[in-house]
Amino acid sequence: MHKSIALLLGSLLLLLGACQSDQGKIQSDEKDQDIKKVTISDVEHGIRANIETRIQNGGGYFNFQNDTLDLSLKLVRVHTEYLSILGPNEFFACVDLATADGDVYDMDFFLKGVPGDMQVTKTDLHKLNGKPYYTWKKGKDKTWFTVPVQNASNDLLGVMEGTDRFDFTYEIQLPEITGSAKMWVPIAQSDRFQTIEIISLQAPGTQEMIQEDEYGNTIMYLQLLPEHSNQKITMSYRVERDEKAPYADQDSDLLKYLEATPFLPVGGRFSTIAEEIISEKKANSQLTKARALYDYIIDNVRYAKEGTYGTGDANYACDAKSGNCTEFHSFFISLSRSAGIPARFAVGAAIPSERDEGKVDGYHCWAEFYAEGKWWPIDISEGNKYTPLATYYFGHHPANRIELSRGRNLTPDPIPRSGPINFLAYPVLEIEGEPGYAETTFSFTRGNPGS
């Protein structure tokens, strides 16, 4: 059913679609002299005041009910870029609110009133986790109305929801070995979101499965000799992986995830930057603060494999404002920890959704932060690539991935001569105590064809 919304023509510019720059939202016509008496700051104050009142009256939650939903929500962010003056005493706001399970609802608010006294007159659910319920259309009579979107899907943007099943192969090509060599290889493990079965493992030399206790990683430790030169190491996993949403983890040592490590500094300029971001966004909870930091990185860091990228050095990310997934998430973790929000790192591989077999383009990493009694999964570099999914990736990881290890500055026993392992996605190789390189490739087949 179409819902007609009469708007004042001389002052309205509606940008179609969801709260995003390419489709847009409602904006004001700044030529209308009568409207200039009200500022966007007034509209922001008005919507925040309405939401705060609803939260206070709702026992700490923004409660929303319609014919099919009964939601208790927490504020994530006000989209200040889409606050609009529709006409004299008529305004628009777009706000993200989240359930305790991490589902993020994009809600459209219409308000009436004057500065200091604005009241919400209409509230619509526009999106769920980045997928729209409706889009905006302009009719021949120059009024705007909403058109329902049926079966909106994230599939085309690389996301598989629910559960994914695939076989994953991790292959290492050993180089020429001139003397004794040692290698540390991550071993994927089962947890509450992924079930891992090793279906084959072929490796030369002496093998030992060792534990890295700080973050609970399992590592295959190999001792190799010259006769193992140019041989292959192959591990194949059968994987069943569930989509991840915010979850409780009672075993977490939160203080550990507030500490600095060599590539994840805490304090100093990171505290200054975090404070400025949080203050500008008027964020007053762990959830809204984390979203403000997430948005800052999306808006200011460029995904580019150039310079000294791939080390996960938050200082480099802060200076260069570019990098791959390691820079994006390291920068976030340093800012988050500096703001008093526990945050942690994991690495693995993202499995293509658009095909069912073939190569995987290297490792991928992601992060989690702690708020509202749960760990919230995020993927900022993917949110940066695909604007429509920036909401989804704040609170979710899709099913089509495998985690290989977690944590930074790993100290297994035995430890490499070079010291703690920064993070473990590709193997660490030492030949006669010096760093070596072994080409590593990933591949997959979806659907467990061997079962």
Regions found by a protein language model. Name each.
Residues 16-18:
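C-terminal motif of bacterial Sec signal peptides marking the signal peptidase cleavage site
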Residues 20-22:
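Bacterial signal peptide processing site
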Residues 29-87:
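N-terminal secretory signal peptides
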Residues 37-45, 118-154, 293:
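C-terminal partner/receptor-binding element of secreted or periplasmic proteins
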Residues 149-242:
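Intrinsically disordered, low-complexity N-terminal segments that are enriched in acidic
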Residues 212-214, 232-319:
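Acidic low-complexity segments
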Residues 330-418:
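Hydrophobic/aromatic-rich core segments of domains that either
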Residues 393-451:
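Low-complexity, Gly/Ser/Thr/Pro-rich intrinsically disordered linker/tail segments
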